[in-house]
């Protein structure tokens, strides 16, 4: 299946969360070029306005914008209400928050807000859109998890655990909804050049790790070539190998190695 078939399969509208920057923004641009009308959502009003102008310059598609903080119930309701005015057939849920560092040093309120965004919004949106798609007899859901969600990730404990939820939910819904015409897959990117990467780089020296970052465009290109054929989509050969070893073959050893690796890579402040 090529990207062009996705509009015919699900179309005409796609809702993309986290479209202000990074992977979400790259999804919005790519899917618009493939012919989808795009419903872009995010917290940064100026970034979404800039994206809307770029989409207008490069495509002839329709664009709908929702400014919403998906870590709040009000933000989720605003997105859902706007999406209900459109014939959305595909959801790409790329919004997410990241945290890192020693578990006991984390700010509790920030960590709980992370869980609201990464877990609560994922549940709410997956529930709403899957119900809508089952009713219309077709639809697609692509949830964005993380490579860290596939294995033990010391110093990323809360973030990785939240992404494990996304991974498990997506895989479970894949099997549950397939017979009802709804495709569900999970994208688990490794290290990617996004604002999230820049935030982590303030505290972690990536040169002391074997991890190599990919561009958001590479991640999105691979994802759309794989969706919906693959349930678990992991861009990058090295990342796929890491997921297999960390999740299935040597999980405890992998976790121990990650603890040593990131403890040494953490910058002193």
Segments (PLM) and residue ranges:
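Conserved glycine-rich Rossmann-like NAD(P)H-binding loop of the short-chain dehydrogenase/reductase
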Residues: 34-50
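Active-site helix of classical SDR
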Residues: 126, 162
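Conserved glycine-rich cofactor-binding loop
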Residues: 13, 18-22
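Conserved NAD(P)H cofactor-binding loop of Rossmann-fold oxidoreductase domains
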Residues: 94-99
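C-terminal helical subdomain
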Residues: 186, 207-243
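Residue(s) in the substrate-gating loop at a strand-loop-helix junction
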Residues: 146
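Substrate-binding pocket helix/loop in short-chain dehydrogenase/reductase
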Residues: 102-115
